[in-house]
């Protein structure tokens, strides 16, 4: 007996010691874990990751950036039945317990003890899931489980039940980069929460358990099983819905499919510029902070720009030969539509041109083709008219080709991906706001932004900058310069003999006519007359870097490597009266709470805000290397130009706090150049632009050697626009693909939309000018140049040879 009592005493002692040790261990663990628990008060001001939204100036969606889809909602925006679906699925006693479901924990412990499973369901309330989602990792351990329980109790003590449920619904992962119930509803069903049906609510409630492997797109069978057998039945058991409602929902097939937010304005190159600028400004996290970025892009103009570039490149291809099918696939004679469509997998649409595979052709010249969505299209015989070959001789079964919508609804035309590229950039000339930007034919195919990154030779479209320097130096539009052969020789004995494009010479001619006709030899002689150093320094006033401009006479022919955006910026100086503006794209930035955190305040061109700068660069001389500036035969006092009856553009004075753009060049030089460039449109290389029926259209075409580049830069109304066409491999565009043929039609089509209902921009002579007759032409001349004009017309001396030789250094 005593021995038994001794054993019992020892056993009791051991049990007491073990209990104490257990209590101490548990207490130590509790202290160790609880002391390291995060402050859950942050949940009241939690910032969930949200994508960045980019909008046009008129509020249309351009792009959404970010690794996740999330659109946080308040609990009051969640329909009651949707809340019930989640409660039935995840935590039926959510509004009853204090964060811990002890029944669920007991059930989980029993399963652990009676099975060989290491992980068992049950035991995690919605509050515990919130604790895990925000503060813990996914490690499966008792230590993490204890931390989860402790955090859940703390959360329940400081947050209301609806606040906890709101956090859960906004934080949970639903697969396919969708976080939160609102993003899931939009992605899987393209609906807002209040538009969901019961079957859709139940499907969404079943996703968080298996978000990647059990969502209704990845595995619709598994998702339906969970919806029907678990979620809906649990809702019935809890009296959230009736059995009839559940049966009706179960009868509906799974119909989820990807739904991306509807992009309202296609401007991918501009959107990428915004993305890069936001990262530079706020760091990589900028894409997940829910910023709303409003750009300067005009939705209507951007869509017009995209359409114009696509049409222009399609027409370019139509002028050249059909290159054949994009690829050919051998298909079985009995292959059905679905089999044919499967061959298009991985072939994306580009620039509005859709890939199709030829099913068959008809003797009448039509072709039946299949799209990737399994739909069939009939191409009429006219679809290949531009190739000069009927469709039934051009195509065969299995050919993969491109089509795009025709002018009439339901019509399709045969196309081919263009071998050339094009870019269009359009600015508000008065403040530099980017209104439209197209960086290439297809952002999908190539993300290289040719508007801002491609450096190409502008050719003759650079000449207005050289002519501007000459006018500043003392030339005037009526100055006579010989269009005659000339040979330049450097110190090493190398010679350069520039040529006109047509290989002909017109002899002495006014520089106005030389610009209108784009005579190369006159441009070279002008530059040689005013000096390379002077010209380079002067041209930097347009925003170019001096090291971008070649330090030789070839500069006058546009051999500098410049971006289309920089050319447009330079032309803006002519369009706005002589001020240098800075292009800009981001107008406003709002945070996730729609609070304004950034507002751009660009420098604005304003002629009435500053006195006219009539001495921007060096003083002029009366004679430059023997060139006559024109003899005045009659001088009249300055008088205003007659205005027509059309409305004219008047630029309102800006707010006093608006920064002023610096004056770049003399406004009188601007007036002369604008007048000359308007003549380029009226009677020069850009007469096609007369179809716009406006008197304020001015610009200059540009082409480079072997037709590698084609340009048109010009302005009208408030906009300055540059269009470039060329090939990325610097190969020729083809015979006679000049700027007026390849680029100008794109410019015209775009500006027809851009200038609709816009007032006519004036070009009135500013103060400090006198109207006089020079060399048989009436021109406006700067007052200080009147006394410098020669008393005789320039004539080549008879003793001079046809070819003159100059030294160049």
Curated annotation (Swiss-Prot):
The chain crosses the membrane at residues 6-26. It is found in: Cell inner membrane. Residues 27-809 are periplasmic. Residues 411-749 are annotated as: Transpeptidase. The keyword Lipoprotein does not apply. GO terms for molecular function: penicillin binding; peptidoglycan glycosyltransferase activity; serine-type D-Ala-D-Ala carboxypeptidase activity. It catalyses: [GlcNAc-(1->4)-Mur2Ac(oyl-L-Ala-gamma-D-Glu-L-Lys-D-Ala-D-Ala)](n)-di-trans,octa-cis-undecaprenyl diphosphate + beta-D-GlcNAc-(1->4)-Mur2Ac(oyl-L-Ala-gamma-D-Glu-L-Lys-D-Ala-D-Ala)-di-trans,octa-cis-undecaprenyl diphosphate = [GlcNAc-(1->4)-Mur2Ac(oyl-L-Ala-gamma-D-Glu-L-Lys-D-Ala-D-Ala)](n+1)-di-trans,octa-cis-undecaprenyl diphosphate + di-trans,octa-cis-undecaprenyl diphosphate + H(+); Preferential cleavage: (Ac)2-L-Lys-D-Ala-|-D-Ala. Also transpeptidation of peptidyl-alanyl moieties that are N-acyl substituents of D-alanine. Its EC number is 2.4.99.28, 3.4.16.4. It is a single-pass type II membrane protein. This is Penicillin-binding protein 1A. It comes from Xylella fastidiosa (strain Temecula1 / ATCC 700964). The lineage of its organism: Bacteria, Pseudomonadati, Pseudomonadota, Gammaproteobacteria, Lysobacterales. The gene is mrcA.
